[in-house]
């Protein structure tokens, strides 16, 4: 990969040539976040990179996740992005902080990397990320149930960051190793519903408690929100006698980014076109990736997400 341009971001707010926002995921799940970003920021351009060749990250070691994420971010910076969103919980949990603190200051100090974990933690704790020490949430009580990949659960990042901000909250987690492969393989609804029900049951039985909130800690899982709602109603509703709110990342992260860009307008520019454009990159087989696009981001027009639009990189 070529060395990134370290020049300062374009300071203008509107241009025919915008600084695109980079969105990265280990595979296709990040398309759910991209779709929400496109709807919330319609006049911005986006570059999406899916590292399908190395997916899923949930089964990788920490050093492997860090290095693959670093290379992906570097690629998006080299394409002209000043801001990259890690639309991957595993990458956000394992690689983001090290990238921000150790790599970014020397490689591209004028650029920024954000993750999808922070907005979720802020939402569940009702505390800004940077001000929790002054004003921890002392009164919020209950149990948060988090469903995520093995690597995200193993990192304990959600657990640690939530407990910092809301020490009275209990946090219980459940790894769901079969959900991403099932979605990528387009398994039928009966299969995915059964898998989800099994994981919800495991969470409750293993911890001997039921969650007051469910957090879907993988960008693939919004596609299974209905399945989680049904499983929660069946297993948890029978115990609590009420429904359980389910927090999904796409809309929460999109609203958070919109607010962030109001405070940091120098990082990207809106195009003067009525609609921004999106360019798609993959490290995998472009034809195979195209076939999965319709389930992960149904709002994308087929012509926009066709195989000719997915650019395969080495």
Placement of each model-derived feature along the sequence:
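Non-catalytic structural scaffold of enzyme domains
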Residues: 1-314
